[in-house]
Amino acid sequence: MNFLRYLGPGLLVTVGFIDPGNWASNIAAGSGYGYELLWMVTLSTIMLIFLQHNAAHLGIVTGKCLSEAASLYLPAWLKNTILATAMMAAVATAMAEILGGAVALQMLFGIPIKLGSMIILVLVLICEFTSAYKRIEKLIIVFVSLIGFSFLFEVWIADIDWAQAAVGWVKPSFPEHSMPVILSVLGAVVMPHNLFLHSEIIQSRQWNLEDDEMIARQLKYEFKDTLFSMIIGWAINSAMILMAAATFFQPQNAKQVDDLATAGKMLTPLLGNAASVVFAAALLLAGISSSITAGMAGGTIFSGIFNKPYEIKSKETRWGILLTMIPAAAVILLIDSPFQGLLYSQMFLGMQLPITVFTQIYLTSSKKVMGKYANSLRLKIALFAIAVIVTLLNIALLFVQ
């Protein structure tokens, strides 16, 4: 029962793991290659568990988020460079999330993309500025649950080949021309803003930093929360690929579906109108919830620049949210092709991710920062290997898009 009371921070992070960018990548994977790329969801989830647990570890042991720790322990010029790029990454993330919500509004109500983006922006800002963290946490848990049930419904009415799926989850496969999709699945899972966010929101669970027994207990509960939440994310991402594979994939004439609106429309003649409506409604929930957490991440990063925690009543946090969400919506509003802007935003995330990951590993490996809770040699090696793999794959993604 203690664990159930602790559950929450990991699910907020999971929202970034099932955001509209993941939807597009997963549907492209399932429609183009059937069940063959399910293994990439498994691999990326395992890597994500290591990285997110490590970020939360920092927050529990130090009482500081990744942004605050960088401000405290790195030279000013380096800290400013890292956190400035992290803020830009938060903007790029928010743009993708807002756009996903706008696509859902268009699918459900015929609202134009640019107007829909402004509606999502207003909804998200109202939610963030009028809600305490605990209320947002409960809201996100409800949204994640509804998204999960939505895909249970989609999988239930689709004709899944479970034998092929079981093989796909564990057997690496590299079908011809699949590398861009493989890379996009990974790139949509490990995201910079989530590392900052997790290290901050884990501190919503109060503890005594002077009590080693309390810290050990918090670390145990945090890992269970992270593991449980990432498994939920793995299941939802897998369900997206399963649904796309069962519905859209044609072995003799494979045609990749990489547009969310098109995917929603194609579901109607194949699975019925209810499937299309549920798909769009779940996308709307994903867009709103991931936009909220992207704004929170921006508030966390910006507050940390001034060595302050995320606190919605503080001007630093509010400015951080506004500096994340308004530019993201403005880009959608001002450019001719929002989806072209989305492509460039994802490319920037791929370039920024190594900066955040290696900064985190440096800080959590430092005895000056973490004391006796610094990363062990084996954990350093594992984290460094994951960081190198993620970095190389994200760099490769820049050249194959």
Where do the PLM segments sit?
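Flexible loop linkers connecting adjacent transmembrane helices
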Residues: 25-30, 53-78, 103, 251-268, ...
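Helix-loop-helix module between adjacent transmembrane segments
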Residues: 47-55, 77-97, 102-132, 187-188, ...
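Juxtamembrane transmembrane-helix boundary signature
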Residues: 13, 40-72, 81-89
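Extracellular/periplasmic helix-exit of transmembrane alpha-helices
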Residues: 47-61, 202-206, 211, 231-262
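A generic transmembrane alpha-helix motif of multi-pass inner-membrane proteins
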Residues: 164, 174-180, 356-362, 371, ...
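Membrane-interface "cap" regions at the ends of multi-pass membrane proteins
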Residues: 1-21, 76-77, 181, 217-221
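Loop-to-transmembrane helix boundary motifs in multi-pass membrane proteins
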Residues: 76-77, 114-117, 228, 288, ...
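Hydrophobic alpha-helical segments and their helix-loop junctions in multi-pass secondary transporters
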Residues: 144-171, 186-202, 359-368, 393-401
